[in-house]
């Protein structure tokens, strides 16, 4: 299909809160396919629709050990969290930058899949971190929001 343009920090459109999807149709399927094409092209493991200027609640994830197939989450909601873990995270919207972020170690998430079927996923480790990171994008939150104001200011100056 096609590779979409990824919004880069400090673009204000990254702060837009995504809207839930009420109907999964060909238009939504095409968005999902283009999101996977974009994520693979950029060598990412996850991508939220808001990162490609589409304000809809869609996440795509792949290339993670726990997955044996690409994962699509539409209207995802974390329903349970437990434990804490920290890991170095990167973001396609903040190129060449990584930071250690503390997140829930285990989560349970409900969502619709590519076909509109309701799914419930219990996960931990890298997949858990990736899902939390991408859901943050859907609510206008970036990994830098977990960092100090001084670190944010330095990154903002670097990316302008």
Curated annotation (Swiss-Prot):
Residues recorded as binding Fe cation, renumbered to this chain, are 91, 133, 137
Known EC number: 3.5.1.88
* Source species, domain of life: Bacteria
Keywords on record: Hydrolase, Iron, Metal-binding, Protein biosynthesis
Which residues does the entry assign to the active site, renumbered to this chain? 134
Please tell me whether the keyword Coiled coil is annotated for this protein: no
The record's SUPFAM superfamilies line, in alphabetical order, gives: Peptide deformylase
Name the catalysed reactions: N-terminal N-formyl-L-methionyl-[peptide] + H2O = N-terminal L-methionyl-[peptide] + formate
What would you give as a GO molecular function for this chain, any one?
Answer: metal ion binding
Q: Does the keyword Metal-binding apply?
A: yes
- Which InterPro entries has this protein been placed in? Peptide_deformylase, Peptide_deformylase_sf
Q: How is the cofactor bound?
A: Binds 1 Fe(2+) ion.
Q: Which cofactor does it need?
A: Fe(2+)
Tell me, what is an example of a GO biological process annotation in this record?
A: translation
Which Pfam families does the record associate with it? Pep_deformylase (PF01327)
What is this protein's function per UniProt?
Removes the formyl group from the N-terminal Met of newly synthesized proteins. Requires at least a dipeptide for an efficient rate of reaction. N-terminal L-methionine is a prerequisite for activity but the enzyme has broad specificity at other positions.
Provide the family line: Belongs to the polypeptide deformylase family.
For this protein, the record's NCBIfam families field holds: pept_deformyl, PRK00150.1-3
Q: HAMAP family, per this entry?
A: Pep_deformylase
Instruction: Output the PANTHER family linked to this UniProt entry.
Output: PEPTIDE DEFORMYLASE (PTHR10458:SF22)
Q: By what name is this protein known? A: Peptide deformylase
Q: Which organism is it from?
A: Buchnera aphidicola subsp. Baizongia pistaciae (strain Bp)
Q: Which gene encodes it?
A: def
């Amino acid at each position: 299909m096609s590779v979409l343009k990824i919004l880069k920090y400090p673009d204000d459109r990254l702060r837009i809160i995504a809207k839930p999807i009420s109907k999964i149709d060909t238009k939504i399927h095409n968005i999902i396919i283009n999101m996977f094409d974009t994520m693979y092209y950029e060598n990412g493991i996850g991508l939220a629709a808001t990162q490609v200027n589409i304000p809809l609640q869609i996440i795509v994830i792949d290339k993670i050990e726990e997955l044996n197939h690409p994962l699509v989450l539409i209207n995802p909601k974390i329903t349970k969290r437990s434990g804490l873990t920290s890991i170095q995270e990167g973001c396609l919207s903040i190129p060449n930058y990584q930071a250690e972020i503390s997140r829930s170690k285990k989560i349970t998430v409900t969502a619709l899949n590519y076909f509109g079927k309701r799914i419930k996923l219990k996960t931990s480790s890298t997949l858990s971190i990736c899902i939390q990171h991408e859901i943050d994008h859907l609510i206008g939150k970036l990994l830098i929001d977990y960092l100090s104001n001084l670190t944010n200011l330095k990154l903002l100056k670097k990316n302008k």
